[in-house]
Amino acid sequence: MSFRNLLVDNRGAVRRITINRPDKLNALNRETINELATAFEQAKQDDAVRAIVLAGAGEKAFVAGADISELATLTPLQAQDTSRRGQVMMLGIERLGKPVIARLQGYALGGGLELAMCCHLRIASEKAKLGLPEITLGVVPGFGGTQRLARLAGRSAALELTLTGTPIDAARAHALGLVTRVVAPEKLDAEVDALADQLAASAPHALRGILETILIGGENGIEAGLDYEAKAFGLCFSTADMREGTQAFLERRKPNFTGC
């Protein structure tokens, strides 16, 4: 399926989804939100895809935010619907069951940071700028920013960044736990690709179990998380990949996980 605002390509078991609106700094409009939901659902259903990289076209921005020219025309009910569409799309990424890496160069602001936060890992260029500046427009973050920022960076930092709207650099974002790694701009693609390849070579059942267990524990508490962890652990023992992993360890070789 072709998209108006996205580029989709595969490199082995890694799928790369690129938001391709560089003239708008990859701003999220309703059409792009809908296309992202479709593209990630396709990646979820494709067994050949084991890891996903989410990127923005050009070097100026991952995503500079929502499309303000579109937002300015919305009625209150349309704005609420747009918020829910974005929230549902990002929940779908968070709950995909396959690891998603956000490649952050330039600006990741507003809806862009919200999109990055629903990804499981975030690799940032040293030149990246991150923030939730919605307060300067007279609105609240609408795509989950108030919830995920507090979970990732803590309540105090979330309040500071949302109440002031002041962007931060990649170094501070890393110190807050908001990004996974910070690298020189010229090393960003190599770092992202290496991590994606590492994840794609892992056992898919175990990857999904880890992603789901951490999410469930975070949303429902440690007891629910531990219960799901035990079930996921047991389920792994029904897979050929578990037998391959243990045998490879005993034979001192690299495992070849097939997803079975």
Name the predicted role of every residue range.
Residues 92-207, 235-239, 243-244, 253, ...:
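Crotonase-fold acyl-CoA enzyme core
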Residues 1-3, 247-260:
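Terminal low-complexity tails and localization/encapsulation signals of metabolic enzymes
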Residues 1-55, 77, 91, 189:
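Conserved CoA-thioester-binding segment of acyl-CoA-metabolizing enzymes
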Residues 22-25, 60, 65, 71, ...:
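A short, glycine- and basic residue-enriched loop/turn
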Residues 17, 21, 35-36, 54, ...:
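Terminal peptide-recognition signature
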Residues 56-92, 108, 221:
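Glycine- (often His-adjacent) and acidic-residue-rich active-site loop
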